[in-house]
Amino acid sequence: MAEYYLQTKDLAVGYQGKALIHDINFGICKGEIVTLIGPNGSGKSTILKSITRQLRLVGGKVFFDDTSLTNISYKELSSRMAVVLTERIRTELMTCHDIVATGRYPYTGRLGILTAEDERIVDEAMAAVHAQEIGNRDFNAISD
């Protein structure tokens, strides 16, 4: 399994213990970009939420960097994996800088207080995508 960074084996996903999709087998190598394509209601988000432990697996296994996902703590997983789903997060009173800073939360303590180093990393990330000038703007006021 070591050739895959993320791999599923006979994965079954669904709700309340009932499999809606089963026999899901795939592997993703480090650096690959993968998209799930299908009609509305086909289970794309359910698969993603199951892989990221937002939903309980109905069956099968997920391996992350050759380790079963069930053996990885939520804190460790959140520092190694990020997922963008279609649901909008509630961003009232948040600036663009605040949104970028949420990517640092897995590295903070329980209160989520950013250190000077965290702030430096957030600033570097915004500079990398030329977004410094919108850092203090209301996130809801910028265009998608």
Which residues fall in each region the model found?
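Conserved ABC transporter NBD signature motif
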Residues: 60-68, 77
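Conserved structural motif at the start of ABC-family nucleotide-binding domains
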Residues: 6, 21-23, 135
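The feature captures the beta-strand-to-loop junction immediately N-terminal to the Walker
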Residues: 37-39
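Conserved ABC ATPase "signature" region
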Residues: 101, 116-135
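Helix-to-loop junction immediately C-terminal to a conserved catalytic motif
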Residues: 52
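Short coil-to-beta microelement around the adenine-binding A-loop and adjacent beta1/P-loop entry
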Residues: 18-19, 75
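Conserved ABC ATPase signature
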Residues: 112-114, 138-144
